[in-house]
Regions:
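Anion-binding and metal-coordination hotspots
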Residues: 1-198
């Protein structure tokens, strides 16, 4: 859903460089990969769904990936190497673990199993690059919330509890377009005043 909207925006604006900000609900590794292939910089925070973190154990982010050797270094300084590869939901996933886990003094802070297994998508580097961009632009999320959330809150308030009065996608699109047009006109009148529009 993210990449088609981003590509359409890029075409509409007629620009070569485009940075797309979206909230966690739009996170999809495959969509972020499609954006990068279309030379669109996506900034979509990764959802925090790790059971380890909520249980107070080490998260995947605590393991450092060494691309040259294709292995992870754990918080104890041991290495988890690639053991197998599988296809999950159409994505190639590599699995890593270490033989040092059963004797590790940090095991209880890492896993409840005999060893910690780490999954890595074949295009995980795309997601990691995006995360570095997000880390380098902490104001981006704040800017998105200021510009987008207020607008949607206002539109939802105007539209009321039923939201759309029409049915079928073409009619709903038309209704939404009219709502957005009304919002934009109101903003222009607040900023410029009514006189320049007459």
């Amino acid at each position: 859903q993210l990449s088609p909207m981003a590509q359409q925006t890029k075409e509409t604006l007629g620009t070569k460089d485009l940075t797309v900000l979206a909230d966690r609900g739009y996170f999809s590794g495959e969509e972020i990969l499609k954006c990068e292939q279309a030379q669109i910089k996506a900034l979509v925070p990764k959802p925090m769904t790790s059971n380890s973190t909520s249980s107070g154990r080490f998260d995947k982010r605590d393991f450092h990936y060494e691309a040259k050797r294709d292995r992870y270094r754990c918080p104890a300084g041991k290495y988890a190497t690639r053991r197998c590869t599988s296809i999950q939901h159409g994505m190639t996933i590599h699995r890593y673990w270490s033989t040092a886990c059963p004797q590790c003094p940090l095991r209880s802070a890492c896993t409840t199993d005999t060893c910690r297994r780490i999954n890595r998508w074949e295009h995980e580097d795309v997601v990691e690059r995006m995360q570095r961009r997000i880390d380098g632009m902490p104001q981006a999320g704040r800017l998105r919330r200021q510009t987008v959330e207020h607008t949607f809150g206002t539109l939802k308030s105007w539209m009321g509890a039923t939201h759309f009065l029409t049915r079928t996608l073409p009619r709903v699109r038309t209704e939404m377009s009219l709502q957005v047009l009304a919002y934009n006109l109101k903003r222009v009148m607040q900023i410029l005043g009514v006189q320049p529009l007459i």
